UniProtKB/Swiss-Prot annotation:
One of its GO terms (molecular function) is UDP-N-acetylmuramoyl-L-alanyl-D-glutamyl-meso-2,6-diaminopimelyl-D-alanyl-D-alanine:undecaprenyl-phosphate transferase activity. The chain crosses the membrane at residues 9-29, 54-74, 77-97, 117-137, 147-167, 176-196, 201-221, 227-247, 253-273, 304-324. It comes from Listeria welshimeri serovar 6b (strain ATCC 35897 / DSM 20650 / CCUG 15529 / CIP 8149 / NCTC 11857 / SLCC 5334 / V8). Pfam families: Glycos_transf_4 (PF00953). Its EC number is 2.7.8.13. Pathway: Cell wall biogenesis; peptidoglycan biosynthesis. GO terms for cellular component: plasma membrane. Catalyzes the initial step of the lipid cycle reactions in the biosynthesis of the cell wall peptidoglycan: transfers peptidoglycan precursor phospho-MurNAc-pentapeptide from UDP-MurNAc-pentapeptide onto the lipid carrier undecaprenyl phosphate, yielding undecaprenyl-pyrophosphoryl-MurNAc-pentapeptide, known as lipid I. It is a multi-pass membrane protein. It is found in: Cell membrane. This is Phospho-N-acetylmuramoyl-pentapeptide-transferase. Its cofactor is Mg(2+). One of its GO terms (biological process) is regulation of cell shape. Keywords: Cell cycle, Cell division, Cell membrane, Cell shape, Cell wall biogenesis/degradation, Magnesium, Membrane, Metal-binding, Peptidoglycan synthesis, Transferase, Transmembrane, Transmembrane helix. The gene is mraY.
Length: 324
């Protein structure tokens, strides 16, 4: 029955997305909700200008429908269900607002950094409050051991850092056709298997709803992309994967399962610090680091496949660490 639920959750999210995206693309084109390409980005990306964005509206809707249906079918809706709903829906709503400002008000950068950060912090605090008053353990698991460290009130700081950090990390990674879609399929599949192994069916259902939605979206988002997810999708996926890692108490494994997100973010931080310290010199040709490889002559598809491969290796190792 449990396996049937997971397959059904995956299938419903996949089917809704596959049907919904082709119907949504003409609607976005009619409204002129097209992607703006930043002037400082790689020149080869200029041809992407005008590609419909905010496609995440479809797959987030599909995921939530599938997730909530099978959560209710499975019995009592748990606190974990609502925590995951908060992460996906509210981070998605923040991203939607950011996208809306970009495409409708023609402000290429969307929300200001301060506005986006305050929104992320507010959502993370709400997540912590629900988590705290639901009597979840406020501990961190030490990798490769059975030791858990009780953080007490410092746990709220960790929640803020983790949710805000990974929502931004996935957002930074979303710069190539299909990159984040494929990495999300890999990462949430890994966490879905871990949650199933731990008998946390609510979390497993959530993960496989996302896998189904993302595989459906990838059909249209792979190179050359017919539609982009926008910040609506990247912020929602980043916040969600951080939330899942907390609920299965495998927070540090996210650094391995989401290794590409970590590398992309680290490349930006290193570039900024080095640029300031050397007054204008750079480590990479351009960051996030996927642009470094593009400017080095790699095709977009080659970069994406390589990064997917690295993400897959990290995910397989992580699942083996937990199960074996």
């Amino acid at each position: 029955m449990s396996l049937y639920m997971l397959v059904s959750t995956f299938a419903v999210a996949f089917i809704i997305t596959v049907i919904g995206v082709p119907l949504f693309i003409p609607f976005l084109v009619k409204l002129k909700f097209g992607q703006s390409i930043r002037d400082e980005g790689p020149k080869m990306h200029e041809k992407k200008s005008g590609t419909p964005t905010m496609g995440a509206v479809v797959f987030i809707t599909a995921m939530l429908i599938s997730f909530l249906i099978f959560s209710f079918i499975g019995g009592e809706v748990s606190a974990a269900t609502w925590l995951l709903f908060i992460a996906l829906a509210l981070f998605g709503a923040l991203g939607f607002l950011d996208d809306y400002i970009k495409v409708v008000q023609k402000r290429n950068l969307g929300l200001t950094s301060k506005q986006k950060f305050l929104g992320q912090v507010a959502i993370s605090i709400l997540f912590y409050l629900v988590y705290h008053f639901s009597d979840f353990a406020e501990t961190l698991n030490i990798p490769f051991t059975n030791i858990e460290v009780d953080l007490g009130w410092f746990f709220v700081i960790f929640i803020l850092f983790w949710l805000v950090g990974f929502s931004n990390a996935v957002n930074l990674t979303d710069g190539l056709d299909g990159l984040v879609s494929g990495l999300s399929v890999i990462a949430f599949s890994a966490f879905g298997v871990i949650a199933f192994y731990q008998e946390q069916m609510d979390v497993a259902i959530f993960c496989f709803a996302i896998v189904g939605g993302m595989l459906g979206f990838l059909l249209f988002n792979k190179n050359p992309a017919k539609i982009f997810m926008g910040d609506t999708g990247s912020l929602a996926l980043g916040g969600s994967i951080a939330a899942v890692s907390i609920l299965v108490h495998q927070e540090w494994l996210l650094l391995l399962i989401g290794i590409i997100f970590v590398i992309e973010t680290a490349s930006v931080i290193l570039q900024v610090f080095y640029f300031k310290a050397t007054k204008g010199k750079r480590i990479f040709r351009m960051t996030p680091i996927h642009h470094h490889f593009e400017l080095g002559g790699w095709s977009e598809w080659r970069v994406v496949l390589t990064f997917w491969g690295i993400g897959l290796v990290g995910a397989v190792i992580s699942v083996c660490v937990v199960i074996f």
